[in-house]
Design a protein with these regions (language model features):
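N-terminal [4Fe-4S]-dependent radical SAM core
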Residues: 1-4, 9-16, 142, 148-196
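Glycine-rich beta-alpha loop elements in corrinoid/cobalamin-binding modules
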Residues: 2, 26, 30-162, 366-368, ...
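Radical SAM enzyme core and accessory elements
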Residues: 3-5, 40, 58-64, 92, ...
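Flexible glycine/acidic-rich beta-alpha junction loops that bind and position SAM and/or redox cofactors
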Residues: 12-13, 104-106, 150, 202, ...
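Glycine- and acidic-residue-enriched helix-capping/strand-helix junction motifs
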Residues: 14-27
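Radical SAM [4Fe-4S] cluster-binding motif and immediate context
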Residues: 22, 170-336, 340, 352
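Short, electropositive alpha-helical surface patch
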Residues: 54, 255-258, 344-360
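Structural recognition of alpha->loop->beta junctions
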Residues: 108-125, 285-294, 349-364
Length: 471
């Protein structure tokens, strides 16, 4: 059968997805399994092609099955709009919606334009679904789906999670080769995504990853990781593991094997500060594999704040980890959660902490109850909007303690303060010289740089966020 995977076009209120623009890793992993079964696949990234060109190519391909990936709550409406268009223009195609958001709240996607909703690991759901369609078998016997049964919808039960991730084929990167130069992170391109593990054993209340994976944690072997790295031509790698180095011995062995292979990349990883504090030697080992940058979900500068989101970490670990990274010369990007219930003192405390620590690359997410999280279950009755585009973690969808304009005044001031701290610690001239060098060497285009700087400046203005509440 012919299967097309479509990534919906750019949308949202502020176009935040354009700041970090990454490849559709899920679809190319699923497509690899389908190709192994003898099916013909295409991956169309409408964020790059544009909707008209992408849809024209899809019609020319004439797929039997169209898969739409909806990973983020903000993508919901445009995913359904795209499904409706596919239904009009390719009426014989079977439309299935998958992705993280569809998995955590499948009932929302029960729509006339959708034939099935895939839940869980796509590699375990899509191949059996496509094979059943090709043989005209009963879809209700395929696990991991919500499917139509006349006018009703039927859940087929959860698909099993495969313990051995090494048994999956390598991602079908040839299907997105033409897009490779378009993907980037933090002004670095080209960028490839890579997964070395799935799941998370922690249970933060704002996150649905641990629920999606039912609190399991599965890993690929170091040998498989090196095999995947050898497949990737991009110089920059973002490792998608929610917590890197969970298994310390595996982290050490991966570093040893990558170094021995001669592969050198610019790695961006996500991890916890308690891991850095306990095992700083891991940072040193991975520095020998190329360059390293670390995203840190600090969430709060107080133990009370960490306890409120069930982080199972301490404010002291956050401080200690940053000092370790500074001593080792490793770049880091801290992210903090801004609670709508904050008063001015809370904002002041965070600004003072950033100034003290020199945490100039900080980012700030507004506490947002996303469907499928414990926070959603606890707070959904208090949500102030039904516009899913507002759930982009930079808009308040819960009541604010401060008047809304004052809340956004303080919120935008955080972004402005982080920029000021950067200039203080790194120097404004040095910052712009580094960015200019990135353009000159082709690591980023002038347009991408201009867009990123423009977005950073936009975030320092309260009206940027307020205007979404006025429409």
């Amino acid at each position: 059968m012919k299967v097309a995977f479509l990534k919906p076009p750019v949308g949202g209120i502020l176009g935040l997805e354009m700041l970090t623009f990454v490849e559709p890793l899920g679809p190319i992993c699923v497509a690899a399994c389908l190709e192994q079964d003898g099916h013909e696949c295409r991956v169309l990234d409408l964020r790059i092609d544009g909707e008209e060109k992408g849809m024209a190519e899809c019609r020319a391909f004439d797929p039997d099955v169209v898969g739409l990936q909806c990973n983020f709550t903000t993508e919901r409406n445009r995913t359904i709009r795209l499904a409706e268009r596919i239904r009009r223009e390719m009426p014989r195609a079977f439309v299935v919606v998958g992705g993280h958001d569809a998995s955590r709240d499948p009932d929302w996607f029960r729509h006339d334009a959708v034939d099935a909703i895939a839940m869980g690991d796509g590699e375990e759901v899509l191949p059996p679904l496509v094979n059943a369609l090709s043989e005209a078998r009963d879809l209700k016997k395929i696990r991991g789906l919500e499917v139509r049964d006349g006018d009703a919808w039927v859940s087929t039960g959860a698909a099993d999670a495969r313990p051995n991730l090494d048994s999956y084929p390598l991602p079908a990167r040839h299907l997105i080769a033409r897009y490779a130069d378009h993907y980037y992170i933090n002004f670095r391109k080209p960028l490839a995504l890579m997964e070395t593990a799935r799941g998370c054993p922690f249970k933060c209340n704002f996150c649905s990853v641990w629920k999606f994976h039912e609190s399991t944690f599965r890993e690929k072997s170091p040998e498989r990781v090196v095999q995947e790295l050898a497949q990737i031509t991009a110089d920059n790698i973002f490792i998608t593991d929610d917590i890197f180095w969970m298994n310390v011995r595996r982290g050490e062995e991966m570093a040893r094997q990558i170094k021995a292979s001669g592969i050198r990349k610019y790695f961006t990883v996500q991890t916890r500060t308690d891991i850095i504090c306990k095992f700083p030697h891991l940072i040193e080992m991975w520095k020998e594999c190329g360059d390293l940058a670390i995203f840190l979900g600090l969430e709060s500068v107080t133990d009370e704040g960490l306890k409120a989101v069930n982080k199972k970490n301490t404010a002291d670990n956050n401080v200690q980890a940053i000092n370790i990274l500074k001593d080792l010369g490793v770049g880091f990007t801290p992210n903090f959660i801004v609670d709508p219930a904050w008063d001015r003192d809370d904002f002041t405390r965070l600004r003072e902490w950033i100034d003290k620590m020199g945490a100039y690359n900080s980012g700030f997410s507004i506490l947002t109850p996303l469907p499928g999280t414990d926070l959603w279950d606890a707070a959904k009755k208090n949500v102030t909007t039904d516009r899913w585009e507002m759930f982009d973690i930079v808009h308040a969808v819960l009541p604010t303690k401060l008047p809304l304009d004052e809340f956004y005044g303080e919120y935008s001031r955080l972004w402005r303060h982080a920029l000021d701290v950067r200039y203080k610690h790194r120097g404004k001239l040095r910052t712009y010289v580094q960015l200019g060098a990135a353009v000159a060497t082709g690591k980023v285009s002038f347009g991408e740089l201009n867009r990123g700087l423009g977005m950073a400046k936009t975030f320092t203005r309260p009206q940027t966020f307020l205007k979404a509440h006025e429409s």
